[in-house]
Amino acid sequence: MRTYDLHIHASPPGESSAVDVIDFAKRLGWSGIALSCFPDSEEIVNSHAKMVDDLKSKDFDVVKAIEIKADTINALHKALDSFRRKTEIVIVRGGDQEINRAAVETNQVDIISHPESQRSDSGIDQVMARSAADNNVSVELNFRQILNSYRKTRVHIIAHMRQNIKLAKKYGFPVAITSGAYSKWELRAPRELAAFGVSVGMELEGAFRSLEAGKIEVNRNKLNQNWVMPGVTISDG
Protein backbone atom coordinates (compact mmCIF):
# COMPACT_ATOMS: atom_id res chain seq x y z
CA MET A 1 0.00 0.00 0.00
CA ARG A 2 1.30 3.45 -0.97
CA THR A 3 0.88 5.96 1.83
CA TYR A 4 0.86 9.76 1.63
CA ASP A 5 0.90 12.57 4.17
CA LEU A 6 -1.11 15.24 2.36
CA HIS A 7 -0.57 18.28 4.59
CA ILE A 8 3.01 19.45 5.20
CA HIS A 9 4.59 22.89 5.05
CA ALA A 10 8.31 23.14 4.28
CA SER A 11 10.32 26.35 4.61
CA PRO A 12 8.95 28.92 4.08
CA PRO A 13 6.64 29.11 6.04
CA GLY A 14 7.74 25.88 7.73
CA GLU A 15 10.95 25.45 9.71
CA SER A 16 12.64 22.68 7.67
CA SER A 17 13.74 22.76 4.05
CA ALA A 18 11.79 20.73 1.51
CA VAL A 19 14.82 18.49 0.97
CA ASP A 20 15.10 17.77 4.72
CA VAL A 21 11.37 17.07 4.98
CA ILE A 22 11.47 14.66 2.05
CA ASP A 23 14.54 12.85 3.38
CA PHE A 24 12.95 12.41 6.80
CA ALA A 25 9.62 11.31 5.31
CA LYS A 26 11.43 8.63 3.30
CA ARG A 27 13.07 7.33 6.47
CA LEU A 28 9.68 7.17 8.17
CA GLY A 29 8.34 4.94 5.40
CA TRP A 30 6.10 7.25 3.36
CA SER A 31 5.59 6.66 -0.37
CA GLY A 32 5.05 10.37 -0.92
CA ILE A 33 4.03 13.64 0.66
CA ALA A 34 2.16 16.77 -0.36
CA LEU A 35 4.03 20.03 0.17
CA SER A 36 1.68 22.96 0.69
CA CYS A 37 2.02 26.67 0.10
CA PHE A 38 -0.32 29.56 0.83
CA PRO A 39 -1.54 30.90 -2.54
CA ASP A 40 -1.03 34.59 -1.82
CA SER A 41 -0.15 35.23 -5.47
CA GLU A 42 0.09 33.43 -8.79
CA GLU A 43 3.86 33.88 -8.67
CA ILE A 44 4.07 32.01 -5.36
CA VAL A 45 1.91 29.15 -6.65
CA ASN A 46 3.91 28.82 -9.88
CA SER A 47 7.24 28.92 -8.03
CA HIS A 48 6.02 26.32 -5.54
CA ALA A 49 4.80 24.05 -8.35
CA LYS A 50 8.18 24.21 -10.08
CA MET A 51 10.00 23.41 -6.83
CA VAL A 52 7.79 20.39 -6.20
CA ASP A 53 8.22 19.09 -9.76
CA ASP A 54 12.00 19.40 -9.38
CA LEU A 55 11.91 17.38 -6.13
CA LYS A 56 9.97 14.40 -7.50
CA SER A 57 11.90 11.19 -8.04
CA LYS A 58 11.23 7.63 -9.14
CA ASP A 59 11.39 6.32 -5.58
CA PHE A 60 9.49 9.13 -3.83
CA ASP A 61 6.44 11.10 -4.94
CA VAL A 62 6.02 14.78 -4.09
CA VAL A 63 2.59 16.33 -4.58
CA LYS A 64 1.72 19.96 -5.25
CA ALA A 65 -0.74 21.34 -2.70
CA ILE A 66 -2.10 24.71 -1.66
CA GLU A 67 -3.75 25.67 1.62
CA ILE A 68 -6.33 28.41 1.22
CA LYS A 69 -6.92 30.73 4.17
CA ALA A 70 -10.07 32.68 3.34
CA ASP A 71 -11.92 35.20 5.49
CA THR A 72 -15.01 35.23 3.27
CA ILE A 73 -16.84 32.85 0.98
CA ASN A 74 -16.13 35.16 -1.97
CA ALA A 75 -12.40 35.05 -1.20
CA LEU A 76 -12.54 31.25 -1.05
CA HIS A 77 -14.28 30.94 -4.42
CA LYS A 78 -11.90 33.47 -5.98
CA ALA A 79 -8.89 31.43 -4.82
CA LEU A 80 -10.46 28.21 -6.10
CA ASP A 81 -11.18 29.77 -9.49
CA SER A 82 -7.60 31.05 -9.70
CA PHE A 83 -5.61 28.06 -8.48
CA ARG A 84 -7.60 24.80 -8.66
CA ARG A 85 -6.16 24.03 -12.12
CA LYS A 86 -2.61 24.73 -10.95
CA THR A 87 -2.30 22.24 -8.12
CA GLU A 88 -2.91 18.59 -7.30
CA ILE A 89 -4.39 18.96 -3.81
CA VAL A 90 -6.49 21.86 -2.50
CA ILE A 91 -6.75 22.26 1.26
CA VAL A 92 -9.05 24.83 2.83
CA ARG A 93 -8.25 25.98 6.35
CA GLY A 94 -11.40 25.51 8.39
CA GLY A 95 -12.73 26.78 11.67
CA ASP A 96 -15.11 29.51 10.59
CA GLN A 97 -18.52 27.91 10.14
CA GLU A 98 -19.32 29.69 6.87
CA ILE A 99 -15.96 28.68 5.40
CA ASN A 100 -16.44 25.12 6.63
CA ARG A 101 -19.83 24.99 4.93
CA ALA A 102 -18.63 26.54 1.67
CA ALA A 103 -15.64 24.18 1.52
CA VAL A 104 -17.70 21.01 1.71
CA GLU A 105 -20.26 22.29 -0.80
CA THR A 106 -17.85 22.22 -3.76
CA ASN A 107 -15.95 19.37 -5.36
CA GLN A 108 -13.09 21.78 -6.08
CA VAL A 109 -11.88 21.24 -2.51
CA ASP A 110 -10.00 18.06 -1.58
CA ILE A 111 -9.52 18.52 2.18
CA ILE A 112 -11.03 20.78 4.81
CA SER A 113 -8.33 21.28 7.41
CA HIS A 114 -9.12 21.15 11.14
CA PRO A 115 -12.74 22.34 10.86
CA GLU A 116 -12.98 22.20 14.66
CA SER A 117 -10.24 24.83 15.17
CA GLN A 118 -11.11 27.55 17.70
CA ARG A 119 -14.66 26.21 17.97
CA SER A 120 -16.90 24.87 20.71
CA ASP A 121 -18.16 22.16 18.33
CA SER A 122 -16.69 19.86 15.69
CA GLY A 123 -17.24 22.32 12.85
CA ILE A 124 -19.26 19.77 10.86
CA ASP A 125 -23.01 19.25 11.20
CA GLN A 126 -25.27 16.68 9.54
CA VAL A 127 -26.06 18.83 6.51
CA MET A 128 -22.37 19.56 5.96
CA ALA A 129 -21.54 15.88 6.42
CA ARG A 130 -23.91 15.00 3.57
CA SER A 131 -22.36 17.70 1.39
CA ALA A 132 -18.84 16.45 2.14
CA ALA A 133 -19.90 12.94 1.12
CA ASP A 134 -21.62 14.15 -2.06
CA ASN A 135 -18.59 16.22 -3.11
CA ASN A 136 -15.92 13.77 -1.90
CA VAL A 137 -14.36 16.39 0.40
CA SER A 138 -12.11 14.84 3.05
CA VAL A 139 -12.41 16.07 6.62
CA GLU A 140 -8.96 16.25 8.17
CA LEU A 141 -7.60 14.77 11.37
CA ASN A 142 -4.60 17.06 11.85
CA PHE A 143 -2.07 15.55 14.28
CA ARG A 144 -0.34 18.89 14.81
CA GLN A 145 -3.53 20.15 16.44
CA ILE A 146 -3.00 17.50 19.12
CA LEU A 147 0.78 17.80 19.27
CA ASN A 148 0.71 21.53 20.02
CA SER A 149 -2.26 21.65 22.38
CA TYR A 150 -2.51 21.01 26.10
CA ARG A 151 -4.93 19.94 28.81
CA LYS A 152 -8.51 21.11 28.27
CA THR A 153 -7.83 22.38 24.77
CA ARG A 154 -6.48 19.00 23.70
CA VAL A 155 -9.41 17.19 25.32
CA HIS A 156 -11.86 19.37 23.39
CA ILE A 157 -10.04 18.88 20.08
CA ILE A 158 -10.02 15.10 20.51
CA ALA A 159 -13.73 15.11 21.40
CA HIS A 160 -14.53 17.13 18.28
CA MET A 161 -12.46 14.80 16.10
CA ARG A 162 -14.32 11.83 17.56
CA GLN A 163 -17.60 13.51 16.67
CA ASN A 164 -16.47 14.00 13.07
CA ILE A 165 -15.46 10.35 12.82
CA LYS A 166 -18.96 9.38 13.97
CA LEU A 167 -20.38 11.59 11.23
CA ALA A 168 -17.98 10.07 8.68
CA LYS A 169 -19.18 6.58 9.57
CA LYS A 170 -22.82 7.63 9.31
CA TYR A 171 -22.69 9.75 6.13
CA GLY A 172 -19.70 8.30 4.31
CA PHE A 173 -17.47 11.32 3.69
CA PRO A 174 -13.73 10.58 3.41
CA VAL A 175 -11.23 11.34 6.17
CA ALA A 176 -7.64 12.51 5.69
CA ILE A 177 -5.21 11.86 8.53
CA THR A 178 -2.25 14.22 8.23
CA SER A 179 0.68 15.39 10.30
CA GLY A 180 0.04 19.06 9.48
CA ALA A 181 3.80 19.38 10.00
CA TYR A 182 5.72 22.65 9.79
CA SER A 183 8.99 20.91 10.70
CA LYS A 184 10.51 17.55 9.91
CA TRP A 185 10.37 16.82 13.65
CA GLU A 186 6.57 17.08 13.52
CA LEU A 187 6.33 14.31 10.91
CA ARG A 188 5.07 10.92 12.01
CA ALA A 189 5.30 7.48 10.40
CA PRO A 190 2.26 6.02 8.60
CA ARG A 191 1.58 3.56 11.41
CA GLU A 192 1.70 6.35 13.98
CA LEU A 193 -0.85 8.45 12.10
CA ALA A 194 -3.03 5.38 11.59
CA ALA A 195 -2.86 4.73 15.35
CA PHE A 196 -3.88 8.36 15.91
CA GLY A 197 -6.92 7.74 13.71
CA VAL A 198 -7.83 4.64 15.70
CA SER A 199 -7.50 6.61 18.95
CA VAL A 200 -10.28 8.98 17.84
CA GLY A 201 -12.64 6.25 16.71
CA MET A 202 -11.57 4.96 13.29
CA GLU A 203 -11.18 1.30 12.41
CA LEU A 204 -7.57 0.37 11.65
CA GLU A 205 -8.33 -0.51 8.02
CA GLY A 206 -10.12 2.80 7.51
CA ALA A 207 -7.28 4.70 9.15
CA PHE A 208 -4.74 3.23 6.74
CA ARG A 209 -7.11 3.83 3.83
CA SER A 210 -7.17 7.53 4.74
CA LEU A 211 -3.40 7.62 4.09
CA GLU A 212 -3.62 6.22 0.55
CA ALA A 213 -3.02 8.16 -2.68
CA GLY A 214 -6.76 8.36 -3.41
CA LYS A 215 -7.42 11.71 -5.02
CA ILE A 216 -3.91 12.37 -6.28
CA GLU A 217 -4.11 10.37 -9.51
CA VAL A 218 -7.66 11.56 -10.18
CA ASN A 219 -6.56 15.18 -9.82
CA ARG A 220 -3.45 14.65 -11.92
CA ASN A 221 -5.63 13.30 -14.69
CA LYS A 222 -7.85 16.38 -14.44
CA LEU A 223 -4.80 18.64 -14.80
CA ASN A 224 -4.03 16.92 -18.10
CA GLN A 225 -4.98 19.35 -20.87
CA ASN A 226 -6.69 16.49 -22.75
CA TRP A 227 -8.99 15.64 -19.81
CA VAL A 228 -12.70 16.28 -20.40
CA MET A 229 -14.48 14.25 -17.71
CA PRO A 230 -13.93 10.95 -15.87
CA GLY A 231 -13.16 8.32 -18.50
CA VAL A 232 -13.08 10.82 -21.37
CA THR A 233 -9.95 12.45 -22.82
CA ILE A 234 -9.20 14.16 -26.12
CA SER A 235 -6.74 12.23 -28.26
CA ASP A 236 -3.84 14.18 -29.78
CA GLY A 237 -4.22 12.07 -32.89
What is the predicted function of each stretch?
Residues 88-90:
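Short active-site oxyanion
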Residues 61-79, 93-96:
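A glycine-rich, hydrophobic loop/mini-helix early in the fold
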